[in-house]
Amino acid sequence: MEENKSINSRFENLEDRMLFYRGRHEQHLPRNSYVMIMCDGRSFSQKIKKKFKQPFDSVFIDAMNDTCAYLCSQIQGAVCGYVQSDEISIFMTNVQTPESTLFYDGRLVKLLSIVSSIATSFFNKKMMEYSINGIFNESDIKNAISEAPLYQFDCKCWDLPSLNDVMGWFLFRSTDCTRNSKQQAAQTYLSHKELMGKHTDEQIELLKEKKGIDWHTEYNDGEKYGRIIFKEQEHHTGTFNGKTVEYERSVWKSHYNKDLTIPENREWLLEIIKRSGVDFSCDSVSRNVTNMLDESYEKAKQIQSDLTLISDINEYFPNELPLFCEEFDSKDYISKLQELRSDIKKLKQVCEKDDES
């Protein structure tokens, strides 16, 4: 109650007070940052299984690609998009000058609500076109529209510290796409009992063995690795003042993605991003991003291995654990870890000798 009185005393009129309430939890993305926007289909699984062919349906894939392309055309600063399953990722930035601002000034609430509503409305439009395609009777069209499911997308948004991390996100989602693609293909033709306990690579081997369907050759790269959407120039010919003129027009188009676990294919994607017209020269990581990715995965593996030490630290040096966690992201992390590893090794040796005696 006292807090409300204090707030009320700051404002001379109702409008200012209401606007204060509306905006006091407003969040902004930082200026000149690399931003990833992700739209994810809400409860798509059952709707897709009922309406579309399995494991992949070109109508659904085209609708997702078109939705991503349309989103990119509507988002100021969009660099490229990635589509897999019912998921869209869009890389957005504006790093040209210190004064550059992001889409909707980086206001998270505004950005998330606008992007999710654009994705939802456009995708439903594409689905409606598909539902009434080839129907000419008015009552049948009305029935098709009334029976058509409504699709919704949620939206998430976050900033990334470097182009290296942008590439890492696309690799992460592409790897997930490949795993899902293998599972979808196997689950379409094989029973749950046949697939139980098998890794995805084992599943597609079984699919080839039992059904003669080779995942590697049966499906295109877009179905296996997702699709990349980026802007490219189209050559056009038209008439102006009675004269034939030629001109270029920028359009957002979808292309099959490649296996991004292969370094050469990551270089291919990096070149697409760099051709977007955005100046990445300020990002020192971008100069050697593919090698940096390889190095970061090796470091990630090492960190994952190092994390197994936490239980030992907690057992032998419980007072050190909070300090260790605080320093996990610092430059002193490696040296601290090596020191603790050495101490734990010595202590374990002492404990083993005590046990023997």
Which residues does each PLM region occupy?
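Regulatory and interdomain segments flanking nucleotide-handling catalytic cores
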Residues: 1-357
